[in-house]
Amino acid sequence: MRFVKESVIRATPERVFAFHEQPDVLSLLIPPWESARVIQAAKISEVGAQAIIETKIFGPITVQWVAQHTVYEPPRLFEDIQVKGPFRSWRHRHIIEPDAEGASLRDAIDYEPPLGFLGRAVAPLLVQRRLERLFEYRHDATRKWCEGESVASGQWPVTSFEY
């Protein structure tokens, strides 16, 4: 299955890529309504590095998600795959390209849900909707940082966003 979210950010591709290279960016990209916490962060610049996130998937069911960085091509692309987690497979490409208004940020995810046929049947209702909400938040957070005053002043880290 595939999920794609694309947004235009009014900043250079280099600035958008630099946002994703910040040490605690993963924590900033977790929406407040998600029951998830970063156990171990990983630099996107280190191919092979693994980030570990503990997240609730349904109700009280918690899983550990291990994502490994597999591609690093600044300032246009980085990629991670799921090594361990809730999906049968997961490949997430973060693509940043020049745009007339700044940069185009595209998250392209190819995934296989768990539970075979049943998982594929419910994915459009459950997984796709959750991804849409999650990546709307992530792109908005990226936009706010890259287009905001923190860029002009060089301030980092931003510790939260107003929603």
What are the roles of these predicted feature ranges?
Residues 9-11, 57-59, 71, 86, ...:
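Beta-strand elements of well-folded, non-transmembrane domains
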Residues 1-42, 46-47, 163:
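Hydrophobic ligand-binding cavity/cleft-lining segments
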Residues 2-4, 62-67, 89-92:
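Short, surface-exposed coil-to-beta transition loops
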Residues 38-84, 104, 137-145, 149-150:
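Glycine-rich portal/gate segments that line the openings of hydrophobic small-molecule binding cavities
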Residues 6-10, 37, 54, 68, ...:
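Generic structural detector for well-ordered beta-strands
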Residues 150-163:
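Short, basic, low-complexity termini and linkers enriched in Ser/Thr/Gly/Pro
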Residues 12, 74-75, 99-102:
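Short strand-connecting beta-turns/loops that link adjacent beta-strands
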Residues 79-133:
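Beta-strand/loop substructures that line and gate deep hydrophobic ligand-binding cavities in soluble
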